[in-house]
């Protein structure tokens, strides 16, 4: 059965807006797990714009389910991951000027660097996932890199303006799931997933984990973290 990986980056974004200690993503992660999230996701960016090293250190000790660390494939980040040992690392592209991750990794262009990072992480006992667009050639390259999983970038699906466009994106995602499964890779998905568009996506099957942050945090402001997480878990469970 598919699982929810709760991304708590936006809690850290609110905290950093005032430079204080609240709200604390560590507390949000604990509440999320109590409500049914089966993993916690954080993105430690090179510019530390939201999640801080302190958050990673504490979450590594307190998360009871699975900690998924999103990060760039840099020497610094690989060293941090090998020291803190999250259960999973998801390699993602980074641009300093972007508000959020805008697209998948270009694994084809950066195959050597990504393969080197994947090997170091896996040698350290960490499961590795690559955040990629639902592109057949990128998935083939991801498999060559030695990664265990792909995380399908669902942004184009989430941004589709109408059902015909959304349906085309779903077909691409479905083909990506099938190819990854064929070559023995696990499949996760994330980016732009909300309480409406999760249903057709989850109905495809083949996705092990949905990493969702913004839509859950937006709802949590209005109804509380417990209700927001439980609502999403229910949608994933009964899609």
Swiss-Prot record:
It is an enzyme of class 2 (transferase). The active site is at 43 (proton acceptor), 70 (proton acceptor), 191 (proton donor). Its EC number is 2.6.99.2. InterPro entries: Aldolase_TIM (IPR013785), PyrdxlP_synth_PdxJ (IPR004569), Pyridoxine-5'_phos_synth (IPR036130). The keyword Cytoplasm applies. 1-deoxy-D-xylulose 5-phosphate binds at residues 9-10, 45, 50, 100. It is found in: Cytoplasm. Coiled coil: none annotated. It catalyses: 3-amino-2-oxopropyl phosphate + 1-deoxy-D-xylulose 5-phosphate = pyridoxine 5'-phosphate + phosphate + 2 H2O + H(+). GO terms for biological process: pyridoxine biosynthetic process. GO terms for molecular function: pyridoxine 5'-phosphate synthase activity. Its main location: cytoplasm. Catalyzes the complicated ring closure reaction between the two acyclic compounds 1-deoxy-D-xylulose-5-phosphate (DXP) and 3-amino-2-oxopropyl phosphate (1-amino-acetone-3-phosphate or AAP) to form pyridoxine 5'-phosphate (PNP) and inorganic phosphate. Belongs to the PNP synthase family. This is Pyridoxine 5'-phosphate synthase. It comes from Pelobacter propionicus (strain DSM 2379 / NBRC 103807 / OttBd1).
């Amino acid at each position: 059965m598919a699982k929810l990986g709760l991304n708590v980056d936006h809690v850290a974004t609110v905290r950093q807006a005032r430079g204080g200690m609240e709200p604390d993503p560590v507390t949000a992660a604990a509440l999320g797990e109590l409500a049914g999230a089966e993993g916690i996701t954080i993105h430690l960016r090179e510019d530390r714009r939201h999640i801080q090293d302190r958050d990673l250190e504490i979450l590594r000790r307190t998360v009871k389910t699975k900690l998924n660390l999103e990060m760039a494939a840099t020497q610094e980040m690989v060293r941090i991951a090998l020291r803190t040992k999250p259960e999973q690392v998801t390699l993602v592209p980074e641009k300093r000027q972007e508000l959020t991750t805008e697209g998948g990794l270009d694994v084809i262009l950066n195959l050597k660097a990504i393969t080197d990072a994947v090997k170091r992480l896996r040698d350290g006992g960490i499961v590795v996932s690559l955040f990629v667009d639902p592109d057949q050639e990128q998935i083939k390259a991801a498999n060559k890199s030695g990664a265990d999983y792909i995380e399908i970038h669902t942004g184009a699906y989430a941004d589709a303006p109408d059902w015909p466009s959304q349906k085309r994106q779903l077909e691409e995602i479905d083909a990506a799931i099938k190819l990854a499964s064929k070559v023995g890779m696990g499949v996760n998905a994330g980016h732009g997933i909300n309480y409406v568009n999760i249903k057709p996506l989850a109905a495809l099957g083949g996705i092990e984990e949905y990493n969702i942050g913004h839509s859950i945090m937006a709802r949590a402001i209005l109804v509380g973290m417990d209700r927001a997480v439980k609502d999403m878990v229910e949608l994933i469970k009964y899609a």
